[in-house]
Regions:
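Flexible loop/turn segments at secondary-structure boundaries
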Residues: 10-11, 179
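Inter-heme linker and motif-flanking segments adjacent to c-type heme-binding CXXCH motifs
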Residues: 13-15
Length: 184
């Protein structure tokens, strides 16, 4: 279970599931804010390793993934082939994906279901890529209307004391199209 996290500027993407020596089974990633992850190597937001045993029963929901473009990830949810093609019962739903995307960056592999995600980029690339690949009949393709993405502070560690940062700018406005758009 990976939940209630705030990650930013990581080399890799938001989530990487690595099967081996057995399958990754019944993993859940939820309630997380990811800002500019995949920044340095263009890693995908979500990478599901297939492997010999695969990723089975994975749920990725109610997360916000935001990235700004050049030099950052341009891949939403690809899978990676390691020894075999096993991906079963993977659900990606009720997420906000905000940032540009490249062609082929959404996995269309059998066993992955996408639904009720909000997908947006100001240049329209994320919407185009997702529409062409995800088969998400309930997707929303509008700006989620964050209050102010520059209103983010980092935490500190000084003299043995931790001060948490905030990401208040990623709250959505009261008339956001994301409100009531998710599956129950």
């Amino acid at each position: 279970l990976y939940e209630y996290n705030y990650s930013h500027d990581k080399y890799g993407g938001f989530l990487m599931l690595c099967p081996g020596p057995g399958a990754t089974v019944n993993n859940i990633a939820r309630y997380t804010l990811s800002i500019n992850d995949g920044r340095y190597d263009g890693a995908p937001m979500i990478r599901m390793g297939t492997g010999k045993y695969g990723s089975i029963g994975v749920q990725v929901y109610n997360n916000t993934m935001y990235w700004e473009g050049t030099g950052y990830s341009d891949s939403l949810t690809p899978d990676s082939y390691w020894e075999g093609p096993v991906i079963e019962d993977v659900k990606v739903f009720n997420n906000i994906f905000y940032g540009p995307a490249a062609s082929g960056s959404v996995s269309t592999k059998d066993g992955i279901d996408y639904y009720n995600n909000l997908v947006y980029s100001s240049n329209g690339s994320a919407q185009e890529v997702y529409k062409a690949a995800a088969n998400d009949q309930s997707a929303v393709y509008e700006d989620p209307m964050f209050t102010d993405v520059t209103d983010v502070t980092t935490g500190t560690w000084e003299n043995g004391k931790t001060t948490l940062g905030t990401a208040d700018g990623f709250k959505i406005q009261k008339d956001s199209p994301a409100i009531d758009a998710g599956a129950e």
